[in-house]
Each structure stands twice: as C-alpha cells, then as structure tokens.
C-alpha cells in the first residue's frame, strides 16, 4: 500500500467503512504510480455537521499537477460504491462514506 500520512492527522475514531474507501482510493492512486497522502482524518476544524467528526470522512492530497482532475475524480467514484462521495475541493479531495438508503 502506497500511503503516506501527513503529520498531525488523527486516525482515532475512523470507521471501518472509510478505511475500506481509503484502501480503494489508494489502489487508484497506485495505478497511476502515485502515493496517496492522507491529509485529514478526525482532527481539524470543519462544518458543524461534518462527517470528519464521526470518523466517516477523510481528506486526500491532490494528484500531481497536470492531472486531469475531473477525470481522476470520476475514476475514484467509479472504483468506489455509491455509498461514497468524492468531492474535489480547492486543495484536497474530500472522501466520505454516507449510507444513501437502507
């Protein structure tokens, strides 16, 4: 697994489902020869109802400059099931697990 963790990232409380999503995302990064950088877990300041606090969201570092980001986001979405949301933010990729229906 080619994964690096930014210093200060808090892993305590991350749910198994988001860890599975992280593993799938790492595979997508690795297929391009890139290392996935985990930039945020359960720490930091987020919106009040953020899934980071529940351990159901993480932030990923962006791929190298020059990458077609919309295509890469679609690649991540395709690799993950519909219970995951992948959102391109200004300086990271937000990955969250959220059950859509029961």
List the model feature ranges, each with a label:
Residues 4, 8-12, 37, 45-102:
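Catalytic cores and adjacent binding grooves of peptidoglycan-active enzymes
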Residues 16-49:
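Extended, low-complexity, intrinsically disordered C-terminal regulatory tails
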């Amino acid at each position: 697994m080619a994964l690096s963790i930014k210093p200060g990232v808090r892993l305590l409380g991350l749910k198994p489902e988001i860890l599975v999503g992280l593993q799938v995302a790492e595979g997508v990064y690795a297929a391009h020869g890139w290392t996935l950088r985990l930039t945020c877990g359960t720490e930091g300041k987020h919106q009040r109802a953020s899934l980071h606090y529940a351990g159901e969201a993480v932030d990923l570092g962006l791929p190298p400059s020059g990458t077609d980001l919309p295509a890469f986001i679609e690649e991540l979405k395709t690799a993950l099931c519909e219970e995951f949301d992948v959102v391109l933010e200004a300086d990271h990729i937000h990955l969250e697990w959220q059950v859509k229906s029961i």
